[in-house]
Amino acid sequence: GTSSGSGGSSSSSGSGSSSSSRGSGSINSGGVSRGISTGSPGIQTTSTVPSGQMFGGRTVGGGMRNGVYGSRTYGSGYPGNNTTTTGKGTTGRNFPYFFWPLTFGAGTASYVYHSDSEYGRPDNSSRPGGPLYTASFQGQAANETFRVLSDNSTMDSLADSLAQYCAIYIRARSGATPYSGANTSSPKPEEVIQYYRASSVALSLDGYNNSAVFTDDESAPDTPLPPLLNMELLNCLNQSIGAHVPLVGEYSTAADGPGLGNSATRVQVD
């Protein structure tokens, strides 16, 4: 199912980012400062990163809000690619949402680990939005812990939206803290239950162990989620991330509100 979200608290600004608690701010992507907003519908047009800039020759833009949902596979969440028709991983990909894919550090499957050499470690301050941060959320019913992972600027503005829309389902939540990698802390790639925005945002469940993460075989099935007592919280987080994850572009009233209607995507629970 899906729903709207809850969130961690804001974090200090990373060097790649600048954001405000009102859900807007800016990032540096492709050598250009670009405004972001939790109410942006996205940018339909694409442009090419100039030579001399990081990832010169790749394209940025083209991703809209109704295409932000991926799957549990690293390399999903790209427009028109809600599964992984172009393969696991993010090597050589363009940037439809301007943000870079997440990285998890060493000790992960090869197609995940290789992203470190391309996009830097989780604490890389050159990434659009700054270093990676994570925040945790616990529901009312049990000790199930969900985590959201993304760049600092995204976490700073998304947290307010999540807290606003999912407060009724949250028993406890942490503020956003720097993410040091899967070697030392959650979330780990095998704990991710949903990727968003070209694999630049992830929602995870502590203790979930998706065996498909440990193989390059694209036909390997995902491990089913365990029975959950906090489905309302999971649904709320999932839909609110989709509805309010910051995108490049200006605020639009058409993108406002807690839900995505028909464009919401279900987290697979069996």
Q: Model segments located where?
A:
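Terminal or extended low-complexity segments
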Residues: 110-270
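Amphipathic alpha-helical interaction segments
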Residues: 77, 82, 106-108, 204, ...
